[in-house]
Each structure stands twice: as C-alpha cells, then as structure tokens.
C-alpha cells in the first residue's frame, strides 16, 4: 500500500470512493461536478493536506484536510474534512496512516490542533439517519455508528460535542393554538416575527458578521438579499 499526495488525475477514483465508502459512512451521493464544487476544486481545498492510499494502481483510501489563518481558530487549527477507505482495506492501521499524514501536514504549517467540526469551510452533505434521503447541509463530524469514530478516539481525538440532526416531517404539521397565544403576548410587548423584507429590514450583514461564523457569513446574507424567505424577529 502506497501513501502519497492526492493528484488531480485521482478525481475519478475519489468519486468512486465517495459514492461507495462515503455512502456507507452516511455521505450523500454526488456526481463529479458536485464533488469538485464541494471538495476537490473548492477554494479552501488544500492539496498539501490531502492524501491517497494506492494499491497496484487503484485508490483504496482518501483523506482530506484544510487549513487557513482566516478560518475559525485557523492560527492553531487544521480541519479534517473526510477519511474514506475501500471496504477491502478499511482497517484501523490504514485509518491511522491517512490521519497521520493529514496531521503531519498540519504540523508542518504550524498548527497544533486537528479538528472535525462545522467550522470547516468544506461542508460535505450527508443523509440524515432514518430519513428517506433527506440531507443535512454539512457533515458535522464523525457518525458514532461507523468504525472511524472509535478509531479516532483511540488515536487521541476527543468528543467535544454531539450534533443532533435537525429534521421534522411536516406533512401533518398544524400550527399549535398555544403559539398563536404566545405570539399575541409577545406582540403586546413590542416583539414580532415577520418575513425578511429587503429594504425594510436592515442590518442583517452586520448582525451575522458579529457572530463570527464563516458559514453563516457566506450563506445567510446572500440568502436574505437573494429573496429566500427568512423569518426575522423584530423589536
């Protein structure tokens, strides 16, 4: 098994791994264009922190990390984006080999922490467990029911938080009467909820920027100014 840096010519094999090993880990299926957009040709993609395992000319493993001083805690953190292994070589040893290469690349850039969180700008879609293919907007970490989770703990990673999928089937939803009563009480106190109206409601860019979340910075103002229906609280 040969460990080496990822090359652009590896993209078709990475796509195969994504839609096999990645699908088994819970990632949403992607075509080549979407995988490029979200990962392999994303502006935050770091070729020097992306590695493959090769056996007799075939890719058996892939791991990607990214760094950047403008990222959240980017002065000290490197972000592990994904680790994929073909089922024929999905072992703790190969996981350690790939992760070790990514971590070494972080150290070479002066980083002291390897993290797997939603602050990673490479936001990879995954299927919410128990749903009929519904996607969460970004892979928040490592699913607890796959081998990679226990392997990373054994390698010294620690669980900092558990994210629960945000999903509700609204087919039979009915607005509760109690919420109508609460809305009336809040309105009497000068607090209301409305749809965001461009040119009427102001300060969304400044409000989001003050929260210091790069994902929200990129998505929420653009959605508001682009006409997406967003709820806003007003006082």
Where are the regions a protein language model picked out?
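Short amphipathic alpha-helix that is part of the acyltransferase structural core
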Residues: 1-39, 52, 163, 178-215
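Basic, amphipathic N-terminal segments that precede the first structured/catalytic domain
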Residues: 31-34, 42, 46, 73-75, ...
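A short helix-loop-beta-strand connector motif used in the catalytic cores of GNAT acetyltransferases and
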Residues: 39-52, 61, 73, 221-232
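Conserved acetyl-CoA binding element of GNAT-fold acetyltransferases
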Residues: 74-88, 117
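Acyl-donor-binding surface of acyltransferase catalytic domains
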Residues: 91-187
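Compact recognition or signaling/catalytic modules
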Residues: 194-202, 216-235
